[in-house]
Structure formats: C-alpha cells, structure tokens
Amino acid sequence: MQPPGEDAPAGCPFSGARAAHSAPAAPAAHEASHVPGDAGWHNAQLDFSKSMSYGDYLSLNSILDAQHPLSPDHNEMLFIIQHQTSELWMKLALFELRGALDAVRTDALPPAFKMLARVSRILEQLVQAWSVLSTMTPSEYSAMRPYLGQSSGFQSYQYRQLEFLLGNKNVQMLQPHAHRPDILEQVRATLEAPSFYDEVVRLLARRGFPIAAERLERDWTQPTRHDETVEAAWLEVYRHPQQHWELYEMAEELVDLEDAFRQWRFRHVTTVERIIGFKQGTGGTSGAPYLRKMLDVVLFPELWHVRTTL
C-alpha cells in the first residue's frame, strides 16, 4: 500500500491509465507446483539415524505412550488427554510465574510483564480446553467413572502450587500429597514462601509507598487478605499512572491474569455441572458446589476494590 499522496510506481497494475499496458504479473510464490524438486522440501534432512529428530527432541515416545485407559470405553482417551495437556500447560504457567517472581524481586519489571502476559494466555488456552471435554455426555462419563477410583483433579499438585503461588493458601491442602514425600516437599515450599502478589506488595514498599509492616512480614501460609495500606498505594498508582507507569502496568497485568483465572474456574464448574450434575466428586469433594465456592475467591483484593474507590 502506497502512503497517501504518493504516485504509484510505473508498471503498477493499480496506476490508472497504465493498468491496461502493464506487464503480466509474475506467478505467485505460493502457487502449487507439480515439479517434485520444487516442492520446497527437497533439501530437507530425511535421514535421522545419526542425529536428533523432532520426535527425539520432544520425547514423543514417552509422551504418546503415557495414555493408559482403564476402561473399555472410547471416551476415556479424551478424559486422559484433557487432563494431561492441562498439566503440561500448568507446568509452563508455573515456570513463567516463578520467572516473573524472580524478576520482580530484582526490580526487573519489563521481563516480568512479558511472563505474566504469557501466563494469562496459557490460562486462556486452558479455558478453551473445556470446550473439548464438554463434548462428553453424562452417559459417556458414567460408563468410565467407576474406573477412576478416587483420583480427582483436586489432587493435582501443580494446580495446588499455582493456587498457592497466586496467594490462595490453605495448609490443609497439603494432606492429599502426604503419600508422596517428594511432591509434598514441593507443595509445602510454595505454601511457606511469599506469593507472587506478596512480592509485588514488597515492590510497592521499595518504590516508597507506606505499606504496613505487618503486611510486609507475615505468616506466608495464610491466604491474601485485604490491606488498607496496599489499597492506598494502588489508589495513588491509578490516580497518577504516568508517574508510576511500571506499577500501573503491573497492576493491569495482575488483573488480566486473575480475570483469565476466574474464567478458567467458571468453565470448570459449568463443565462439571454439564457432565455429572451435582454428584459428589470422585475425590470426595461436593463436586460442583465446591467449585462454585471457589468462584468467590479473590486473589488480588485491593486491585479489584480500588476500582470502586477511584
């Protein structure tokens, strides 16, 4: 496209009177060719007997051999892959969130913004994944449910670490992992450390905002609670965004993340209601009612309340 006011170059088919006399256009580069040598892959490496292939790099043999249905039901494969892929996405979300946390601790906020944005996009991917599982009907799930035993997503240790890292702490949630000392150690370490939001509150203090001492050093195993001094700091940021642009951007990245996380939770509960109604969950929870209670959890309370205060 030519900028406004500039003449099109000679020979351009859109240049008015010259259009009728312009030379025929060259064949498009993407047009299909029937010549094998021109297919675009003739120089590609085809022998991987002595080098690493795509499958080798991704350990596809291990990944694709990790689905072991216990029932004869066709739909169990969907159920397994849905949860396995969700665990892979959560692994990446944890990786990015911990990287962002390290960046915030050193006041390197631009890299943290990039990582937080990626976590939000991961959560959007997880939201869309429920659409695939929702193709399973109650009848189909009932056929395979007896084979699941007491296994449940409630027991996902990666999901629990994600909740803890985002500030929704609960000491009792260690118990489902007591039979795996290695896993228990990981989950406990996340429980006992400051959450991502705790580190952001410390960042506010480093930037000169008067945050209450008891908020900066507290029992990290407890969930995030609303704090007036934190809200006052965010109020100042939102009233003068140009003066506190990095903090303003951090606030919006966090709201974006929690927004996506809420959508993921909502799609979770609606998918459960659609498939099993209000039956008890396989892990012993109340099922949909338990998940609905989780919709009321607020991860970053001051960032939501400050919108009313403004």
Curated annotation (Swiss-Prot):
Renumbered residue ranges of the record's region Disordered: 1-36
Entry superkingdom: Bacteria
GO biological process: L-tryptophan catabolic process to acetyl-CoA; L-tryptophan catabolic process to kynurenine
Binding site for substrate: 79-83, 141, 145, 282
Top enzyme class: oxidoreductase
The protein's name: Tryptophan 2,3-dioxygenase
Pathway given in the UniProt record: Amino-acid degradation; L-tryptophan degradation via kynurenine pathway; L-kynurenine from L-tryptophan: step 1/2
Function: Heme-dependent dioxygenase that catalyzes the oxidative cleavage of the L-tryptophan (L-Trp) pyrrole ring and converts L-tryptophan to N-formyl-L-kynurenine. Catalyzes the oxidative cleavage of the indole moiety.
Keyword vocabulary terms for this entry: Dioxygenase, Heme, Iron, Metal-binding, Oxidoreductase, Tryptophan catabolism
Disulphide bridges: none
EC number: 1.13.11.11
Cofactor binding comment, as recorded: Binds 1 heme group per subunit.
Entry-linked Gene3D superfamilies: 1.20.58.480
Gene Ontology MF, one: metal ion binding
Family note: Belongs to the tryptophan 2,3-dioxygenase family.
Subunit-level organization: Homotetramer.
Cofactor(s) annotated in UniProt: heme
Pfam families, A to Z: Trp_dioxygenase (PF03301)
Residue numbers binding heme: 268
Database matches in PANTHER family: TRYPTOPHAN 2,3-DIOXYGENASE (PTHR10138:SF0)
Species: Burkholderia lata (strain ATCC 17760 / DSM 23089 / LMG 22485 / NCIMB 9086 / R18194 / 383)
UniProt catalytic activity: L-tryptophan + O2 = N-formyl-L-kynurenine
Biased composition (Low complexity): 15-36
